[in-house]
Amino acid sequence: MGVSGSKGQKLFVSVLQRLLSERGLHVKESSTIEFYQFLIKVSLGFPKKEDLNLQDWKRVGREMKKYAADDGTDSIPKQAYPIWLQLREILTEQSDLVLLSAEAKSVTEEELEEGLTGLLSASSQEKTYGTRGTAYAEIDTEADKLSEHIYDEPYEEKEKADKNEEKDHVRKVKKIVQRKENSEHKRKEKDQKAFLATDWNDDDLSPEDWDNLEEQAAHYHDDDELILPVKRKVVKKKPLALRRKPLPPVGFAGAMAEAREKGDLTFTFPVVFMGESDDDDTPVWEPLPLKTLKELQSAVRTMGPSAPYTLEVVDMVASQWLTPSDWHQTARATLSPGDYVLWRTEYEEKSKE
């Protein structure tokens, strides 16, 4: 981390993502860049050296804690504490971590094959050696030894020898890559064992400080950016349908049901007038005149159903002999649908009483 600006940021992000991926943690590049910019703002002395040790990283943690106390925890990125804890564990396992060296020495199998092809095709030209690591040095040395006597042979033998030499080089490169993969695998196993056997007691910070840092890390943990074990999908059950109690019957059916409950069936029979009376006093049913019905309908629409004139017309209609069916038909013909529903409801309630 001896360079600054965009180059230093790219190196830091690349190295940090590779170290975390080796531990099975995948962090987004945007989160790593945000963490790097946060460290630059919090710690004025970071980064200054090519290597990073545990003491410097603990100092960065103290500065993060002080920054959170001054500006509040909302000003700290969500992934700051988890990344800080993971890198602290890495530095605990190995005292000094040379990040730039680890980045420069990471040679992939594709790079080795490209270097081998370039050496075989340019055997008659000037040879140039890079600083790619020990793997390229071994390949260049073998190519120099074999190229000394290639051109002394006839053309056919030379072509045949070139093919054999190319196969030998490919086998050697594969062996080198295999040795590198084996060493990486052993190193990962060693790091895992060291991680499991790590002593979490620390003398530089008090137990309260470490607890505070770990609580903040758990508080700012985000499953969308730091992918941990997959959660099982919870299947929600459909809510059971509510069963409502059926409403009691209304109207004549309601009256019959109430009479059956109370054991009184007198209202189920028609009313019969008993006694002596003149024929003139016997009520005679006549249909409601159409003129009276129109007058009542006009009064309801123009003045309202509760206007004094409307009530006078209703009293005139009530002076005649009307059956319940006549009243229902009259109300339906003169009132609006809403007023008719209200009238019928009140009529049924009064009938029950």
Curated annotation (Swiss-Prot):
A lipid is attached at G2 (N-myristoyl glycine). Keywords: Capsid protein, DNA-binding, Host-virus interaction, Lipoprotein, Myristate, Nucleotide-binding, Phosphoprotein, Viral budding, Viral budding via the host ESCRT complexes, Viral matrix protein, Viral nucleoprotein, Viral release from host cell, Virion. GO terms for cellular component: viral nucleocapsid. GO terms for molecular function: DNA binding; nucleotide binding; structural constituent of virion. Gene3D superfamilies: Human Immunodeficiency Virus Type 1 Capsid Protein (1.10.375.10), Retroviral GAG p10 protein (1.10.150.490). The keyword DNA-binding applies. A motif (PTAP/PSAP motif) lies at residues 305-308. The keyword Transcription regulation does not apply. p10 is myristoylated. Residues 151-169, 178-192 have a biased composition (Basic and acidic residues). GO terms for biological process: viral budding via host ESCRT complex. Residues 151-192 are annotated as: Disordered. InterPro entries: B_retro_matrix, B_retro_matrix_sf, Primate_lentivir_Gag_pol-like, Retrov_capsid_N, Retrovr_matrix. Nucleocapsid protein p14: Nucleocapsid protein. Binds to single-stranded DNA. Late-budding domains (L domains) are short sequence motifs essential for viral particle budding. They recruit proteins of the host ESCRT machinery (Endosomal Sorting Complex Required for Transport) or ESCRT-associated proteins. Gag-p27 contains one L domain: a PTAP/PSAP motif, which interacts with the UEV domain of TSG101 (Potential). This is Gag polyprotein. It comes from Mouse mammary tumor virus (strain GR) (MMTV). The gene is gag.
